[in-house]
């Protein structure tokens, strides 16, 4: 299915006897809410090649909608990694989208590396023909970022923490 702002691919919908029948909602226990037309919306952005292989490229929820354009937060993650490859070593960072008054959303980069600078990221974007939309508008520094026991980034907790921090800063500025 087409996803606004995604040029190649779309959202994967699946249907079949092995797919769940629907959802049981907490506000109406015991009542099954069937899937629309029997189709399950996976939330995965996929591309299908010329011979029919399906490639999962991203998650719909890992996008920022900035001024009507969809920006992949995974692509921003990758851009940050590549922009700082020259430093060697590992550092932690996460990218989240938060509300923006006029543009819909904005990208926030959170890292434990105090050498990460917007100028370096901006140069990387410019030198690699990327859109300015990929540039994080805010960079926050933390000693530790939230992760699951597996070591994978906990983006839900990170976004919550970022929203709390930005809200506190706006309260002080007001």
Where are these regions (language model features)?
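Conserved ATP/PPi-binding loop(s) of AMP-dependent carboxylate-activating enzymes
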Residues: 1-33, 69-71
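Short, acidic, Ser/Thr-enriched surface-loop or helix-capping motifs
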Residues: 7, 48-49, 147-148
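AMP-binding/adenylate-forming catalytic core of the ANL superfamily
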Residues: 16, 21-22, 43-134, 151, ...
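Short, small/polar residue-rich loop motifs at catalytic or cofactor-binding pockets
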Residues: 35, 40-42, 140-141
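Short proline/glycine- and acidic-rich turn/helix-capping motifs at secondary-structure junctions
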Residues: 102, 138-150
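Acidic/polar alpha-helix N-cap and adjacent early helical turns
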Residues: 161-174
């Amino acid at each position: 299915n087409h996803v606004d702002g995604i040029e190649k691919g779309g959202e994967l919908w699946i249907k079949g006897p092995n797919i769940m029948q629907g959802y049981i909602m907490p506000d109406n226990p015991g009542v099954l809410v069937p899937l629309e037309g029997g189709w399950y919306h996976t939330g995965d952005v996929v591309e299908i090649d010329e011979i029919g292989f399906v490639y999962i490229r991203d998650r719909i929820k890992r996008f920022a909608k900035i001024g009507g354009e969809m920006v992949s937060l995974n692509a921003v993650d990758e851009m940050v990694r590549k922009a700082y490859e020259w430093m060697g070593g590992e550092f932690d960072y996460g990218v989240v989208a938060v509300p923006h008054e006029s543009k819909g959303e904005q990208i926030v980069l959170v890292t434990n590396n105090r050498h990460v600078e917007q100028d370096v990221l901006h140069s990387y974007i410019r030198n690699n023909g990327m859109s300015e939309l990929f540039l994080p508008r805010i960079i926050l520094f933390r000693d530790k970022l939230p992760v699951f026991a597996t070591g994978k980034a906990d983006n839900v907790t990170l976004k919550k923490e970022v929203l709390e921090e930005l809200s506190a800063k706006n309260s002080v500025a007001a």
